[in-house]
Regions:
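Positively charged n-region of N-terminal signal peptides that target proteins for export
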Residues: 1-5
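Cell-envelope and extracellular/periplasmic
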Residues: 86-415
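EF-hand and EF-hand-like Ca2+-sensor regions
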Residues: 56, 62-83
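Acidic carboxylate motifs that coordinate Ca2+ or other divalent cations, activating on Asp/Glu
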Residues: 38-42, 60-62
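EF-hand Ca2+-binding helix-loop-helix modules
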Residues: 20-36, 47-55
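Bacterial N-terminal signal peptides
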Residues: 7-15
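Alpha-helical segments with a strong preference for the paired helices of cellulosomal dockerin domains
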Residues: 28, 44-51, 65-74
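Intrinsically disordered, low-complexity Ser/Thr-rich linker and spacer segments
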Residues: 22-23, 27-28, 74-88
């Protein structure tokens, strides 16, 4: 097994540590620091992430990284990556065990742990699997959270750092925070567990059970490795140390698959297979699935009709059937027409995700046709702003509550 060996960096300034560098040794150091502290996986160290580094390594408390403190940071990162030498070879084995939790899929969840926590013996241990891209990972700032979301809860756990921990975000957060709180209130005698495997900008092929670098790399995600394998590693270990009752799968993803025609066209079939695989491998054949999406068929139809001429609409209606035509049928005809439109026309309407309408339609179809799959429509949620598609702190709290309400309605109907 190869291990990155970091060189001493006594002369490196803080700016060099955090900035790209043409010197290969210094760049290796920077990437190692980024790998450890980039909690939201956006490829840079944001203010909160740099503040965490400063808080951890500012030994003299002067508010800046001095020469010796920078060296200590580099050594700390190096020691985390290198296995301890053991005559019996146990060091390599333990390093391999640790490495399965230091993956892209777990990076943000690892930053949300608030210390190891035992699972209460009373009641059920209801575990929810959360997967998706950036708005599941969460770009909302943890410093904007207010009580009770900043406090440990006796009956809420998150899978972090290869174990069950209290759920207390320290850098960024997604919808799981408020969702878990509301579900704990819904089931006052049970404990809520969250297993989150998510990575910003990841296409659905990055989550497939039958993962391959080539397929994942259609959305440039090959280097992230198999996120499904991450999930199964967590499930196996969680089963070993606790008795989880898998109670739901939450999927917040789609934007990355709106970039290419083939991605949008195949989305439904891949999602259907993903759900089948998750249910089988979790041993929960009827596992309910909750998928927050962007808009329902009616709103999506309104959105795509804006870019069509009256003549195009007449032709499409004739293909769809005699009026009155169901929204789903008309939408299918519209999307078939748009699938043959020029990419330039679609980019003019949908920006850098010209085929996003096909993805949204596939998610809506899944909610209609697949058993125990609910597509959720939270509406327009508050965003960070500045052209950023990421949901802000207020929006993530709303999304978590809306998702928890959908879970509650599902289980109420079963009573």
């Amino acid at each position: 097994m190869k291990h990155m060996i970091l060189v001493p960096a006594i002369a490196l300034s803080t700016a060099v540590l955090f900035s790209a560098d043409k010197n290969p040794k210094r760049e290796k150091i920077r990437k190692a620091i980024l790998e450890q502290y980039d909690a939201n996986d956006n490829g840079t160290l944001d203010g909160e992430e740099r503040a965490l580094i400063l808080k951890t390594h500012d030994a003299n408390g002067n508010g800046k990284m001095d020469r010796g403190e920078r060296l200590a940071l580099v050594k700390a990162v190096a020691n985390k990556q290198k296995p301890k030498a053991r005559a019996d070879g146990e060091g390599d084995q333990k390093d391999d065990e640790a490495s399965i939790w230091n993956t892209t899929g777990f990076k943000q969840a690892n930053s949300m742990g608030g210390g190891e926590a035992a699972i209460p013996k009373s009641g059920k241990f209801r575990v929810f699997v959360l997967m998706g891209q950036s708005n599941m990972t969460g770009a909302a700032r943890a410093k904007e959270l207010k009580p009770p979301y900043t406090e440990k809860h006796d009956r809420i756990r998150i899978w972090a750092n290869g174990r069950w921990e209290y759920f207390v975000p320290s850098v960024r957060f997604g919808p799981g925070v408020s969702m878990a709180r509301q579900l704990a209130a819904f089931w006052p005698d049970d404990t809520i567990g969250i297993i989150k495997v998510a990575s910003g900008g990841t296409g659905i092929r990055g989550f497939e059970k039958n993962w391959s670098f080539e397929r994942a790399n259609l959305t440039f995600d090959g280097k992230k490795g198999s996120l499904y394998k991450d999930l199964m590693n967590a499930v196996a270990e969680a089963k070993r140390m606790s008795k989880p009752e898998f109670s739901g799968f939450v999927w917040k993803q789609g934007g990355a698959d709106g970039t290419k025609k083939v991605l949008g066209t195949e989305y439904y079939d891949i999602f259907k297979q993903l759900i089948s695989d998750v249910r089988k491998d979790l041993g929960a054949p009827d596992l309910p699935v909750f998928m927050p999406s962007y808009m329902n068929d009616e709103d999506l139809l309104k959105a795509v009709r804006r870019i069509l001429s009256d003549e195009e609409l007449r032709k499409i209606r004739n293909l769809a059937g005699k009026p009155p035509v169901k929204d789903a049928d008309l939408l299918a005809a519209v999307l078939a027409h748009l699938n043959e439109a020029s990419p330039a026309k679609l980019r003019k309407a949908f920006g850098k995700r010209p085929y996003i309408a096909a993805v949204i339609a596939a998610q809506n179809r899944a909610g209609r046709e697949l058993p125990n799959v609910a597509t959720i429509y939270p509406g327009e949620l508050p965003r960070i702003g500045g052209g950023n598609n990421h949901i802000n702190a207020e929006g993530q709290i709303q999304l978590g509550k809306i998702t928890a309400s959908a879970v509650g309605e599902f289980y109420k109907a079963k009573r």
